[in-house]
Amino acid sequence: MCIRDRKYNVYVLSDLAYAEIYFDKKPPPSILQVNRAKEIAVEFTSMSKTYAMAGWRIGFAVGNKKLIEALTKIKSYLDYGAFTPVQVAAATALNGSQSCVSEIRSIYESRRNVLVESMSRSGWNIPSPKASMFAWAPIPKKYQNKGSLKFAKDLMTKAEVAVSPGIAFGEYGEGFVRIGLVENEQRIRQAAKNVRNLKL
């Protein structure tokens, strides 16, 4: 892809915000691993997911020098930089022990496993996500003609389970719901039991 894009003078911006939240010991590849990718690509990552700094608005970009310089210039028009204590916290996280990253990854992987297994017992087969703190789950056959919004509403009213309807993410999200892996395993199991009320 990178070689082809050079021919057409196209740049690639890669969002790798969930780079460290991967499962089954299979980290996602970086576009910058591709030969000559730095000639056309910039990769962004966020401290939000890896270090639980959501809302702190801090991350970094690496890649094509000219694009990074342009990004720096544009950013200077938008703000004056991140609050100093946030920068110090981010530097401390990056330079400190990374055991917390492994721990967070392990917690999300365990929650993912519980979600997939317990929902399957409740009649809803969810493919096992390979990464991130979300499961992108196909809506059951019973709801395919009714849509993701109806399914999400029924989950809320009949099972007391909150999910995001796929349609909220655009037309290609229809047919799916997004489930956050942010609750503990006991709550995930309880949610799966409640899903049985829908008789999927």
Which ranges hold each PLM region?
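PLP-dependent class I/II
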Residues: 4-200
